Amino acid sequence: MSTLTVDNVTKTYGDVVALDSVSFEIENEFVVLLGESGAGKSTMLRCVNGLTHPTEGEIRLNGDPINGSRSDIGMIFQQHNLVDGVSAYMNALTGSLDRTSTVSSLLQQQNKETKERALEALQTVGLLEESHQRTSQMSGGQQQRVGIARALVQDPALLLADEPVASLDPSSAESVMDYLKKAASVHEVTALVSLHQVNIAAYFGERFIGLRDGEILFDVSPEKLTPGLVDDLYGNVETVGLATDNSDNSTVDTSDGTRYDTETGSDGTDEVDVIGRQVES
């Protein structure tokens, strides 16, 4: 597990203040960033990922300042950013590019450990049987799950996701979020996820940070995420009732029709046997 510390971070673009003295710490949690478009969620994630630098303040991962892009931070985007024309397996392998540096080495020189890690990541997101299917033939939800697998191949200490289900239908969105949370749990990764769908956020989040105009409006646990707080955050918009816990349900139907056991992490596939066959090939 890992600890992310955001210490008094301000980010400005000219006269525009995108983040204003933001501070929080996350350790071993699945945390959701909430807020309207333009609230600062994406800017916050870009600062954490090292894609942009704070104007003031500091961001640290396990005590080390984040000063640039790091291979131990996995990022999942709203747009899948997958490689066209290749399989889910090959797309998952691109998560190791920081270690291999070139596409040529990705295709020809991966060791068995890296190949196995890619297949295990696909198993985590319920796509092991589809590992050799071209991602262009997959649904949007399946493609996003490949994106999660790709991030896991990096073996990250921190997992970030920027509106990962914004373009998906409700059923696919719930499935992707379920696999994302499972991935963070199985791989023991601290996660920070930005969402605008309050119901989905309330169902999956373990903690909620509300951003408005670049400032933290609230930082609360699930039981304290009230409709009043949500109305304050989104300007008194009409919201559907917050999601309730259904942790007693041990199975869900994924977007590809698979009956998935959320407790055992199994879709009925013999993981060891399948991984063994595919790695050897």
From Swiss-Prot:
Organism superkingdom: Archaea
Sequence ranges assigned to domain ABC transporter in this UniProt record: 4-238
Predominant cellular place of this UniProt entry's protein: membrane
Known catalytic reactions: phosphonate(out) + ATP + H2O = phosphonate(in) + ADP + phosphate + H(+)
Enzyme class, broadest EC rank: translocase
Keyword Metal-binding applies: no
Pfam families associated with the record: ABC_tran (PF00005)
Positions that bind ATP: 35-42
Cellular compartment(s): Cell membrane
EC number(s) given by UniProt: 7.3.2.2
Nucleotide-binding in keyword set: yes
GO molecular function: ABC-type phosphonate transporter activity; ATP binding; ATP hydrolysis activity
GO cellular component: plasma membrane
InterPro entries documented for this protein: AAA+_ATPase (IPR003593), ABC_transporter-like_ATP-bd (IPR003439), ABC_transporter-like_CS (IPR017871), ABC_transpr_PhnC (IPR012693), MetN_ABC_transporter-like (IPR050086), P-loop_NTPase (IPR027417), Sigma_54_int_dom_ATP-bd_1 (IPR025662)
Bias kind Low complexity: ranges: 244-255
Family: Belongs to the ABC transporter superfamily. Phosphonates importer (TC 3.A.1.9.1) family.
Main function: Part of the ABC transporter complex PhnCDE involved in phosphonates import. Responsible for energy coupling to the transport system.
Protein known as: Phosphonates import ATP-binding protein PhnC 2
Organism: Haloquadratum walsbyi (strain DSM 16790 / HBSQ001)
Lineage: Archaea, Methanobacteriati, Methanobacteriota, Stenosarchaea group, Halobacteria
Gene that this sequence comes from: phnC2
